[in-house]
Amino acid sequence: MFLLVGLGNPGKEYEKTRHNIGFEAVDKISYEYNIPIKRERFKGVFGDGRISNEKVILLKPTTYMNLSGESLREIIEYYNIPITNVIVIYDDVDLEVGRLRIRTKGSAGGHNGIKSIIYNLNSEDFIRLRIGVGKPQRDMVSHVLGKFAKEDEKNIEEVLKIIPELAYTIINQGPQEAMNKYNNFRAE
């Protein structure tokens, strides 16, 4: 069983912001594999289904970003999901818009949602799928809570389009194969 988590903030005012790209990515997977995300529990909304022959749970924590780890801890404990089968999708300001980076472990890199997950799981050994949202030209909070510039929207759509295939690759062929295939991806 795999847990795919998209990070974001709840509420209409945060929709389509850079910080909510994880929610959008999980919505894309939900649509592509017909896994509705409608059940409310574990401090989030989730749904379960299959990608290929693997059972998967899709989760969008409804805590704010800096408390995301609480939601993950609850669902992981309930379903007894191995931490190495957890895939967290989130925004990364250190990657340019349209870039992807997959890692199997590591530090939080300054991301408060990832800090919360590492703290609550007491582990860094989960898979991270980072989506580039670009460096801020002004302060960080305004940047991540802001919407994408018109010229960036095409690149973001291109990235979101390949997310379901990327998730399939991680689940069926492993994270190393996904890294080989997608870590050099650049939306043009």
Curated annotation (Swiss-Prot):
SUPFAM superfamilies in the cross-refs: Peptidyl-tRNA hydrolase-like (SSF53178)
Entry superkingdom: Bacteria
Site (Stabilizes the basic form of H active site to accept a proton): D91
EC number(s) reported in the record: 3.1.1.29
Binding-site positions, tRNA: Y14, Y64, N66, N112
InterPro entries per UniProt: Pept_tRNA_hydro, Pept_tRNA_hydro_CS, Pept_tRNA_hydro_sf
UniProt GO BP: protein quality control for misfolded or incompletely synthesized proteins; rescue of stalled ribosome
Record GO cellular component, one term: cytoplasm
An annotated Gene Ontology molecular function: peptidyl-tRNA hydrolase activity
Site (Discriminates between blocked and unblocked aminoacyl-tRNA): N9
Name of the protein this chain belongs to: Peptidyl-tRNA hydrolase
Gene coding for it: pth
